[in-house]
Amino acid sequence: MGKYNLTALQVRKTAIDSIAAGKKGDLPRWVNVVGDIPPAQILVRERPQQHPLVRQRMKTIPGNPTPQPVFQVQTKRVKPKKASRMFLPVEIKYEEDQLRKEFFRDHPWELARPRILVESSGKDSERYNWSRMQQPGKKLDGESVVQRQLWLLNNVPDMTKSRAYDIARREFYRLRLQEDIERRVAVEEAEATGAVFGPSRLEIGMELENQQFEAWKSWAKTEAQIVDQASTSEDGSENQSLP
């Protein structure tokens, strides 16, 4: 059939004919499965489905005192692709992806904080109510800011992206400051009752850095002496060679 090779579509018929012709062995177990679920006969591949970005906003419509939800569909311009990449799956994007990118760009050290990635049932997010920043059973982190900002954009009338970001950050800073104060008070109370704490992670890191610096300084001093001795010996040999 021209350039199309349809041998794979006839694999079941080939196996049955081989057994019928007296070939030794049993009929493969997959023969009945392939008979129930035959291979596709369509030779034309369809391009992958496009995934538009849908945004929900609350808008105040003139003449209507109640704000109405408005869904904005942002269609992505389809760029011409190479033939080898034409049928690759299309990337799925969500609105919070951009919000998350902006927050961690402004707060890169939030990525250094330890995070819990294990979920008990996989539906933990369904129990959260992002009308407020702090959620029971969830540690305060950058994702809290992202979800809080998204809730403000979806539920507060005429809310802009920058204003929602400022509100979410202000609440986040206030709660983070409260956590720091509680941590300091707990340490002071423990030390007042006789507790002794070891070096912090920052102090341990500085000590390791100092050790590496001292080792490098010793190595650099030795290398400098070797270079000086080599240059001195070369100067001496040149002076001896002169008449």
Curated annotation (Swiss-Prot):
It is found in: Mitochondrion. Transmembrane segments: none annotated. One of its GO terms (molecular function) is structural constituent of ribosome. GO terms for cellular component: mitochondrial small ribosomal subunit. Pfam families: MRP-S25. Keywords: Mitochondrion, Ribonucleoprotein, Ribosomal protein. InterPro entries: Ribosomal_mS23_fun. Component of the mitochondrial small ribosomal subunit. Belongs to the mitochondrion-specific ribosomal protein mS23 family. This is Small ribosomal subunit protein mS23. It comes from Emericella nidulans (strain FGSC A4 / ATCC 38163 / CBS 112.46 / NRRL 194 / M139) (Aspergillus nidulans).
